Amino acid sequence: MLNLKVKMDGAVISMFKGEEGNKRILIYNPLSIFYLFLLLFLTIFLLPYLIFAGRIISYSLEIPPKAIFMIFLLSLFGSQVNLKIREARSIQPVLAFREISFFGVKWCIPEFQYGIRKTIISVNVGGALIPVLFSLFLLFYSIPALEQNLTVAYLKVFVAFIVVTLVVHKLARPIKGLGIAVPFFIPPLTAALASAVLFPIYVKTNPFIIAYVGGTLGTLVGADLLNLGKISEIGAPIVSIGGAGIFDGVYLTGITAIFILWLIV
């Protein structure tokens, strides 16, 4: 196995090439002793909030507090790792200078040329992969264990997912050099309101599971997956789904929706 490291825009990119020539790229932000201490300090600083929030989330989703705390830590440290999905190419105008010499005097003439820009599309472990895996756990383990009418429960989650997806996709915009952005409060508020309306219908269903799963997966699909075709408009060398880690919309939507739901249910 071949291991290559490339530095791009302040990030260290580790490339792993298998025996069959398939490339798997892990992208790490620069890790240092200072940064690790910063993460540790951040964890300790947020500990009172984590205990309080963890108990609410644990009670709401009926998950042990230790598991919630472990998910947060994994998301925190997993936010430094991005897994490559594919590579997109687009034709972009590039400003170049052509040198002309006239009677010993050199002139630099600016002109536009077109070149191929490569953009790496990746998934952030902490900001997207872990929340999605946790959502799948709630879907295929928690709901069958807690709900009496699985058809109704899954239908409510699906409706909430569709509502969040449509609203988020409508408001999501590509930001040059940054990524796909959407107003922060829109996804969790939409998920919470949809859950508040849906959970008492026919048979009562855990509203917090509806809000978390519908909000997390709806934000992922509406903001990121449905906008993959707009990657060429961003013009960034790397686009990471959930790339802001624990501060990303995919990660925060489910958690924030739970807190909003506590206020309105």
What are these regions (language model features)?
Residues 44-56, 132-142:
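Membrane-embedded alpha-helical segments in integral membrane proteins
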Residues 1-15:
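N-terminal amphipathic/basic-hydrophobic helices that include classical n-h-c signal peptides
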Residues 51-55, 80-89, 109-111, 166-177, ...:
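C-terminal ends of transmembrane helices
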Residues 63-89:
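Glycine/small-residue-rich interface belts in oligomeric ring/scaffold proteins
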Residues 16-53, 60-70, 182-186, 194-265:
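C-terminal transmembrane helix-loop-helix hairpin of multi-pass membrane proteins
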Residues 86-136:
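A glycine-rich, hydrophobic loop/mini-helix early in the fold
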Residues 112-129, 151-153, 178, 241-247:
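Membrane-water interface at loop-to-transmembrane-helix junctions
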Residues 128-131, 135-207, 215-220, 228:
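Conserved mixed alpha/beta catalytic, RNA-binding, or beta-rich assembly cores of soluble enzyme
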